[in-house]
């Protein structure tokens, strides 16, 4: 049963995984309104644009009535205040996440004491998942089925499939050019082979 408060779930979500989806669904059962807030993260260099990520998350959470998806570029606490959120959701996958998240929670509390940080652990089946790992598996042609929502899986395959096809095409063109160059004699070699021999026949 929800308590009526608005919860903000911020992140880069590049891409949105089933771990993120699990936390979103569970947060929606606890709070009256959940806002998934997508950050641009220009320092990281993302696979999908902010607009693409927002659209993918909207599609993945379409059946969740209490969930909204927005983009933001200001401080997360400012975003929370602007959208009327009283709670900020943060996921903890493992002990290794705790130190960073604890520091961030203390900083956010200093900046905005009225916004309460709530830590949530994902379901055990998603406890190892993170976006970087999913992208690496997809980039190398691995199966990401069950790791991300279906719409995200489709877009990952399209994105990395196109990149792989382009790389194979470039490699093939380079090999063809190399083979052609190897078969074609140089101008200097051609002149040398056509010049009369100065040696006398014995």
Can you say where each PLM-predicted feature lies in the sequence?
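Nucleotidyltransferase catalytic core that binds NTPs
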Residues: 1-202
